[in-house]
Amino acid sequence: TVYWFNLLIPTRRPLIGNCSQYGHGVFGNDGDHNLVQSTAYIASRVWADADGDDRVGAVMIQNGQVFTSREVQKADARPGGYIAYGGHGGIVGNTVEDPVLSFVPVARHTHTSALTLDTLPRSVPGIHGSPVETVDGDGHLLPSALPKVTIARYVNYGQDDFSDSADSEVEILARIAKNLRDHPLSGIVAEGSAPYGGVYESMRAALLQAVFRGMPVVAVGRGGGGYAFGQSTLGGLLVRGSNLSAPKARILLMASLLKFGALPVPVDPDAPTAVELDAIRSKVAEYQLVFDTH
């Protein structure tokens, strides 16, 4: 949720998420303490640049640690149960005493994001070519526009056979069919090998079926620390998901779909021409720029 706000809300002020792992009033409740430390973070202005604008982006403050929203993940239901995951770090400061920052993220955020609500087009193309309205006249996001993005996971020795046919990837094929019926803005995050983002041949074929039907696919690794390699894009037809974890890549793809819409669909999705493939690569490049900078 905090990462979603980080991408869409164009605020120049600090945006902080908190969680209480124990209920309010319970002995050892950490929620109240997290709120107090967040207030101290705001008052300290360590987040401000020379112009007084937020230079960090949305953060989560838990148990004295300041996490960037891009790289925080819940690992356990106890105090201290949030960890840095994805990226290379994630903890940028602490609030144990006076709030301090040790690092400032370079990823675009809040008022520097390319995906803020005030920059979204009123409509984008859906997978069937018809426009999908994204915001109303007041600039509010329409619930009906929220994209459907799911995660397909690679597991070693998981394929049914050694065929490179998509036929055995029944989960991905069923999701493609459901998206075509019900979700004009949709995509898939492919969580591949660690850290390279590779998948086996039949899964690759199924993911390309999604791409050729207008659904962008983002390749990430399951390791949570390394970058997906260039070869995971299958020649520029998939988006390389940087060093994002699969859940965060899902959030970024949802926001990007509201900005760019569906990929161009070939006349015959099972036999795209060279010109149609180039058109897909051109659209994927727009997504890639966002994933490289957010």
Regions from the language model: what does each represent?
Residues 1-12, 199-207:
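Short Gly/Thr/Asp-enriched flexible loops that form oxyanion-binding sites at enzyme active sites
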Residues 7-11, 16, 28, 45-54, ...:
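Solvent-exposed alpha-helices and their adjacent loops that cap or buttress functional pockets
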Residues 19-24, 64-66, 194, 223-225:
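Acidic, glycine-rich active-site loops and adjacent beta-strand->loop/helix elements
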Residues 176-181, 186-294:
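C-terminal non-catalytic interaction/assembly regions of soluble proteins
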